[in-house]
Regions:
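Short beta-strand edge/turn micro-motifs at domain boundaries
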Residues: 142-170
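Cleavable N-terminal signal peptides
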Residues: 11-12, 22
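Non-transmembrane domains of secretory- and envelope-associated proteins
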Residues: 167, 171-183
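Early exported N-terminus immediately downstream of N-terminal targeting peptides
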Residues: 26-105
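Bacterial N-terminal signal peptides that target proteins for export
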Residues: 1-10
């Protein structure tokens, strides 16, 4: 027993060394790192112009796939209708929602003109967190944007975005609910 204890402690130490850094990343640090991957895409001269739209959006989508949990976003959007969908319908809806978000965000991102992002706070509650930011325009106008994130393994993934306090997924949920109820 005494001979096993040092080995167990050594193993525990190794696990902490290799696992702790993944868990040590805060939601804000992870989101900031991901956003910092998108900004160079928008500034890249070889991706500018209408002829490069498809290529530019594919690069943005690749980063979005690292940041977003489209399945959780889809579940939120469908609300009570989610449980009545088959796995195949859920996967298809999540994919289509990802496409919708890509088009909506990509169009706005392509209008990027040197705005700054200020990270103003973070609230973590277990596996859920809110990352508070402000987008600051060149004119000094501040637009509050909060990201609702959840932990999946060692990553924090966005599942909702609140712009000036209004939930994007809540907005889609109201629209989809109306469509589903009338069809």
């Amino acid at each position: 027993m005494i001979r096993v204890l040092p080995r167990a402690l050594a193993l525990a130490g190794l696990i902490v060394l290799f696992v702790a850094p993944a868990w040590a990343v805060t939601p804000t640090e992870q989101l900031k790192g991901s956003i910092e991957k998108i900004l160079p895409i928008l500034d890249e001269p070889s991706l500018k112009g209408d002829a490069k739209t498809k290529e530019r959006r594919a690069a943005i989508r690749a980063v979005a796939n690292e940041i977003f949990d489209f399945t959780e976003s889809a579940r939120l959007c469908l609300g009570p209708h989610w449980d009545r969908r088959t796995d195949q319908e859920r996967q298809e809806f999540a994919r289509l929602l990802g496409d919708l978000l890509e088009r909506a965000f990509a169009a706005r991102l392509e209008q990027y003109g040197g705005e700054r992002i200020a990270y103003t706070g973070e609230a973590v509650d277990g596996n859920l967190a809110t990352v508070k930011t402000k987008i600051i325009t060149k004119a000094g106008v501040e637009l509050p944007v909060d990201y609702q994130v959840l932990r999946r393994g060692d990553r924090w993934l966005v599942y909702d975005v609140l712009i000036e306090g209004v939930s994007l997924m809540g907005n889609y949920r109201a629209q989809f609910n109306k469509i589903i109820q009338t069809s």
